[in-house]
């Protein structure tokens, strides 16, 4: 078996990985302004950095919202599309070896995928808030999109300054029948 290259052309990043008989090889993330530039940039950088010849590749599998822009084989290689939710479910099952799990894929948006028995995979929901929201808000409010800088800033912060607590909206604890939280606690507790 030769190598299969998996490429997730997302809304803001392209993720690429190779799989061969020995397992997963060298994951990589590439950012670009448009999906086609991101796809070809990721593919070229991946095979160059890892010393992979086009002859070593049996197949290219594409997924993600940006993969819809690709309707021809990449560099003459066998190229197919797969459902992003199926790919997320299969990938999480493969990595975790769990038979039953919920996969939370937080990209530009966030999706929830249910895996049952390691075989039945279904998309159970999602929200439009994810890493793209964090990057956009960080760019506007903090003047940086660099996630490492954002994390450093967050580590210096005081969570009580932004995390709404029950005592902030109610001066008495909620009845036990509604929750176990006391007035000074947050949902994180």
Task: Identify the role of each PLM range.
Residues 4-41, 121:
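Short glycine-rich, Thr/Ser-proximal phosphate-binding strand/loop in the N-terminal lobe
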Residues 119-174:
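Glycine-rich phosphate-binding loop plus the immediately following alpha-helix
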Residues 180-189:
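Single conserved hydrophobic/aromatic residue that forms the stacking wall/gate
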Residues 43-58:
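Phosphate/pyrophosphate-binding loops at sites that engage ATP/ADP/AMP, CoA/4′-phosphopantetheine
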Residues 64-68:
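Short, polar loop motifs at secondary-structure junctions
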Residues 70, 75-104, 109-119:
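Conserved phosphate-binding catalytic cores of ATP/NTP-utilizing and phosphoryl-transfer enzymes
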Residues 31-34, 83-90, 126-134:
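Short, acidic/turn-prone active-site loops that include or flank metal/cofactor-
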Residues 2-20, 100-116:
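Gly/Thr-rich phosphate-binding beta-strand-loop-beta motif of the actin/hexokinase/Hsp70
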């Amino acid at each position: 078996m030769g190598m299969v290259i998996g490429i997730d052309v997302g809304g803001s990043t392209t993720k690429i990985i190779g799989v061969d008989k020995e397992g997963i090889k060298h994951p990589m993330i590439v950012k670009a302004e448009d999906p086609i530039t991101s796809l070809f940039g990721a593919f070229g950088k991946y095979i160059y950095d890892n010393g992979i010849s086009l002859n070593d590749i049996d197949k290219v599998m594409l997924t993600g919202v940006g993969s819809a822009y690709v309707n021809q084989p990449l560099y003459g290689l066998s190229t197919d599309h797969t459902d992003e939710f199926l790919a997320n479910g299969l990938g999480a099952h493969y990595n975790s070896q769990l038979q039953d799990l919920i996969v939370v894929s937080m990209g530009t948006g966030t999706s929830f995928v249910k895996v049952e028995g390691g075989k039945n995979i279904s998309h159970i929901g999602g929200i439009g808030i994810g890493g793209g929201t964090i990057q956009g808000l960080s760019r506007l409010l903090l003047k940086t999109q660099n996630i490492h800088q954002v994390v450093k800033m967050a580590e210096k912060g005081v969570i009580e300054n932004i995390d709404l607590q029950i005592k902030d909206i109610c001066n008495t604890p909620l009845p036990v029948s509604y929750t176990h939280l006391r007035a000074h606690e947050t949902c994180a507790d």
